[in-house]
Regions:
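PLP-dependent amino-acid enzyme catalytic core
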Residues: 1-190
Length: 190
């Protein structure tokens, strides 16, 4: 099973669930697995999968201590009804869009990342993370301890984090933002 250690030290070896639960290593580093470069994913096979299948396969490979059922539930909960597009992050052909270059130019595509509940690209991650955290062993059903997320924002991250953790079992969230330094819309969203 893959273990995770800090980018600043190899002292502590953690499971994926424990690394997700802790978030940041005690030395301030990020958690990473040495097996990341060794994990094999069939890239050609991914090309024909929808977002849900793709997410299940990639997350299942990178987070081996989560069961296939846990990963599937996280993916379905995170993206099933919270995104405006069934494709979650649709890739759109820019052909025919105003301002397109000459017909002889290379095809151009763009991935739309604003279909989440707060229209911020951060929704893609912040809808998944709370579901993964809610399934960490120390926060499993019936556990007495809770996870408290404390974060700061100067914009879209705050609302995306609040939306992601809003219904996460065993998790709470507090978002700080600088008074008068976020837009009125962002302030109202939070």
């Amino acid at each position: 099973m893959a273990t995770y250690h800090s980018t600043r030290s190899r002292t502590a070896q953690l499971s994926a669930k424990e690394a997700i639960r802790r978030g940041i290593a005690p030395d301030g580093g990020l958690y990473v697995s040495d097996e990341l470069g060794q994990s094999k994913i069939d890239l050609e096979g991914l090309a024909n999968k929808d977002y849900f299948e793709l997410a299940r396969e990639v997350l299942g490979t990178l987070l081996p201590d989560y069961t296939a059922d846990e990963i599937a539930a996280c993916v379905d909960e995170a993206y099933g009804s919270t995104f405006a597009s069934d494709e979650v992050t649709p890739v759109v052909d820019l052909k025919g869009v105003a301002g397109e270059a000459d017909q002889g130019s290379a095809p151009a595509y763009v991935m739309e990342l604003w279909h989440g509940p707060t229209s911020a690209f951060k929704d893609v991650a912040l809808q998944m993370l709370p579901r993964l955290m809610a399934r960490t062993s120390a926060n499993a059903e019936g556990a007495a301890d809770k996870i408290m997320i404390v974060t700061a924002t100067s914009g879209d991250t705050g609302k995306a984090a609040l939306a992601g953790f809003a219904d996460a079992p065993g998790c709470g969230i507090t978002v700080f933002y600088p008074e008068g330094k976020v837009s009125r819309v962002q302030e109202l969203q939070m």
